[in-house]
């Protein structure tokens, strides 16, 4: 029997980045379990993913399963049959458990004791007849934090499924799902090479995708992004901040990532860099750029999934987006500076810390008491003790400022950013 590669692709609308990563990590194991459960031998399994597709591929999948004969020893014959030779409950239960008829049980002598045996024969089956159900079940078994239905369909998936590709060697596996039947065509990059594109065999799918502007693995897309960022850093003399969490999301937002440089008005540099960086990283998935001395530059990196020919338009659109976000940040920061931090402390009464422990204002009083006790134990007096008490009093004031309400990852540093100016 010839062994062939089996490749299955689920083509979709853009999948959520973190959910896609989680599904990618589990898909290989799920596929292996499904093949093993059906008695289908296979070689190495590979998983590929982009925002618009999940692909799983297994090497060395045979055309047919092997014919199998299994022999199972059961209870002693004197227990399995009564005096008249009729099967007892023990024999009936054993036969039922092994999937054979009690009349087919055999008696065999073993060291002077007669036992009953069940011989179970499983014929060879063409693998391509088993695969449609296996692959359909694989689709429905993928876990998504949130799923949706589309059109008039009852099936659900993380995002609408638009095409299916399934081939074993050069034979199409007719998997059906959500009104679609798998074929031998795939789609390339949505804008650069949409397709559809004919694929000659299961082995050829990944090469066809690469030829049509699809980078099929997270690792390759991340390497491409980092290489492009390094080239920009060398050209500009600036340094990019590439947090792992943001990078993990960005690699699953583009099938063919192109890194571009955007710019914002220098007036936003007056806003604490923590707020500006938060606005870019957390809210827009832009990578900030810093000068060699560590100060924030008025430039940022865009990871685009669009056509590089339209870079000017893409950059302009993203600059408009970041400008709107930074105008908001500057507005909230400027408004926060109009009042001393002490004014915000009393508003902490509106923030519940924990139902049984009261508000954050009550927590502030406890922090102040702790600060006094620690200062006294440390022998602090005069200005040192007063500074400790004041720091404790203001520690949570930033939680009700406009900037922190709008940019929720900022509070760890926002108090010290505003303190020199407005207190």
Predicted segments, located by residue:
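Glycine- and acidic
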Residues: 9-17, 117-121, 210-214, 230-235, ...
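Inter-helical turn/loop segments and adjacent helix faces that build the functional surface
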Residues: 236-237, 374-384
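Metal-dependent catalytic cores of enzymes that make or break cyclic nucleotides
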Residues: 403-412
């Amino acid at each position: 029997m010839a062994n062939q590669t089996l490749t299955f692709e689920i083509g979709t609308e853009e999948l959520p980045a973190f959910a896609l990563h989680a599904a990618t990590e589990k898909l290989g194991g799920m596929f292996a379990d499904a093949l093993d459960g059906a008695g289908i031998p296979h070689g190495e399994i590979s998983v590929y993913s982009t925002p618009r597709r999940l692909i799983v591929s297994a090497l060395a999948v045979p055309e047919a399963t092997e014919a199998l004969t299994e022999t199972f020893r059961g209870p002693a014959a004197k227990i399995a049959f009564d005096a008249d030779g009729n099967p007892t409950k023990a024999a009936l239960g054993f036969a039922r458990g092994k999937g054979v008829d009690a009349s087919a049980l055999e008696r065999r002598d073993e060291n002077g004791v007669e036992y009953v045996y069940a011989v179970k024969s499983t014929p060879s089956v063409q693998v391509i007849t088993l695969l449609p159900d296996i692959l359909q079940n694989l689709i429905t078994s993928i876990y998504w934090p949130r799923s949706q239905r589309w059109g008039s369909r009852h099936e659900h998936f993380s995002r609408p499924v638009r095409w299916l590709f399934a081939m074993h060697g050069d034979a199409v596996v007719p998997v059906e799902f959500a009104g679609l039947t798998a074929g031998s065509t795939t789609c390339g990059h949505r804008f650069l090479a949409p397709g559809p594109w004919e694929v000659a065999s299961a082995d050829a799918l990944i090469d066809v995708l690469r030829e049509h502007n699809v980078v099929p693995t997270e690792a390759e897309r991340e390497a491409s992004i980092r290489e492009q960022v390094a080239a920009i850093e060398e050209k500009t003399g600036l340094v990019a901040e590439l947090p792992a969490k943001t990078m993990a999301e960005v690699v699953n937002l583009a099938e063919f990532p192109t890194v571009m440089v955007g710019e914002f008005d220098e007036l936003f540099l007056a806003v604490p860099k923590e707020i500006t960086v938060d606005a870019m990283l957390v809210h827009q998935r832009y990578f900030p750029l810093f000068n060699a001395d560590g100060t924030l530059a008025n430039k940022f990196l865009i990871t685009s999934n669009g056509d590089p020919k339209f870079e000017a338009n893409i950059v302009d659109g993203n600059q408009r987006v970041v400008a709107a976000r930074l105008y908001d940040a500057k507005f909230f920061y400027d408004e926060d500076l109009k009042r001393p931090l002490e004014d915000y402390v009393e508003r902490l009464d509106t923030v519940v810390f924990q139902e049984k422990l009261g508000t954050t204002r009550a927590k502030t009083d406890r922090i102040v008491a702790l600060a006094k006790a620690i200062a006294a134990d440390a022998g602090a007096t005069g200005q040192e003790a007063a500074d400790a008490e004041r720091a404790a009093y203001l520690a949570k004031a930033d939680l009700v400022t406009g900037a922190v309400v709008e940019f929720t990852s900022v509070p760890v540093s926002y108090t010290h950013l505003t303190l020199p100016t407005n207190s």
